[in-house]
Amino acid sequence: MMAQVRRTEIAAALLGTVMMACRPAPRTSIDTETQVRKVLSQTLPAMDGRGLRVTVLEVTYGPGGSSRPHRHPCVVVGSVIAGTLRSRVQGEPEALYRAGESFYEAPNGVHLVSANASDRDPVRFLAYFTCDHDAPLSEAVP
């Protein structure tokens, strides 16, 4: 039993070392502005009589960057490409999403925090919105 526990500890240590070695190299230029680039917007075929649209945005927050409180009237699935995203939706605990991690946001959740967790490096993520055709992707919250 002790040998099995020891092998597990060694395997975990080796995996951690490999994962650290495979991290992306830090960026040499620092982007201090928030950038949003539409990657895709495609109307989907009607399903059960509902017309939907999927839109993919690439969002970049510069070091210390963030957005103001807002909500999305549609489902959002996101994936962090680089850096660490700090997020807090009303009624939920604050969360950190690192490069390679994904997140889900229910429609109309109020985003109290959407920010770069770093003061040195930008964070970049893809946000996949699935909405009604006429729905705006984001609405400011006073």
Predicted region positions:
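Histidine-centered metal-chelating micro-motifs
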Residues: 66-68, 86, 101-103, 107-116
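A short beta-loop-beta micro-motif enriched in histidine and acidic residues
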Residues: 52, 64-77
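Sec/Tat-exported extracytoplasmic proteins
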Residues: 58, 63-65, 81-84, 89, ...
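Glycine- and acidic-residue-biased ligand/ion/polar-headgroup-sensing regions
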Residues: 73-92, 99-101
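Short acidic-glycine-tyrosine-enriched beta hairpin
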Residues: 61, 90-109
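A short, N-terminal "cap"/entry segment at the start of jelly-roll beta-barrel domains
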Residues: 2-55, 96, 103-104, 122, ...
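Ligand-binding loop in jelly-roll beta-barrel domains
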Residues: 93-94, 107-136
